[in-house]
Amino acid sequence: MDSNSWINCPPVFSSSPSSRRYQSRSDLYLGDVEGEDDLKAEFMCPFCADEFDIVGLCCHIDVNHPVEAKNGVCPVCTKKVGLDIVGHITTQHGNVFKVQRRRRLRKGGYSSTYLTLKKELREANLQSLGGSSTFIPSSNIDSDPLLSSFMFKPPSAIPITEGDSVAQVSPKDTSKSKIQQESFSNEDQEKAKKSKFVRGLLWSTMLEDKF
């Protein structure tokens, strides 16, 4: 089975029913499709009338209409679905996903709408894990002083002026220096832990985008 199905939406890390739905949808087979030019490029959301391609529509319904999606009209076949519209689309209309993938490959990428929906799903996943719901892309790292301080600032050092020598340092000064060094050391350790967490989060996000 091809792992490059529509569910290039970020992986869901919880064991909730929605995560199991995503996993089952990731098993769609993508191959040659007959009459792909006859299929619509976009479909209207049955709940808010916005138009998306089939991939974007499924992401949109899962994010914005999870409750309504349990009962509604399929936008592809216009039949009334009594349970899980997105599950119905992915299982009964897999050929549409194949067509959309071919069209995306010909155009050379994904639409900004799809990328926005993908980001929303990632933020929802982080929220479900009790983490922050704000995702900061690598291009915005420089504009975020807190994140920048975690990732790029070297450990602080105690300045030493010319003329200072070991002989000139009294025991009292040495004691103060040790306290300062311990304080800096604790602060650096805390920054290192935060930096490691942020780097791991950014790396996992970049790997998701690649695969």
Swiss-Prot record:
The modification Phosphothreonine is found at residue 113. Disruption phenotype: Plants show a hypersensitive hypocotyl growth response to both red and blue light. One of its GO terms (biological process) is red light signaling pathway. Pfam families: Di19_C, zf-Di19. Induction: Induced 3.1-fold by red light, 2.6-fold by far-red light, and 2.3-fold by blue light. Not induced by abscisic acid. GO terms for cellular component: nucleus. Expressed in seedlings, roots, leaves, stems, flowers and siliques. Not phosphorylated in vitro by CPK3 or CPK11. Residues 163-194 are annotated as: Disordered. Keywords: Nucleus, Phosphoprotein. Residues 167-186 have a biased composition (Polar residues). InterPro entries: DI19, Di19_C, Di19_Zn-bd. It comes from the Eukaryota. It is found in: Nucleus. Involved in both red and blue light signaling. Belongs to the Di19 family. This is Protein DEHYDRATION-INDUCED 19 homolog 7. The lineage of its organism: Eukaryota, Viridiplantae, Streptophyta, Embryophyta, Tracheophyta.
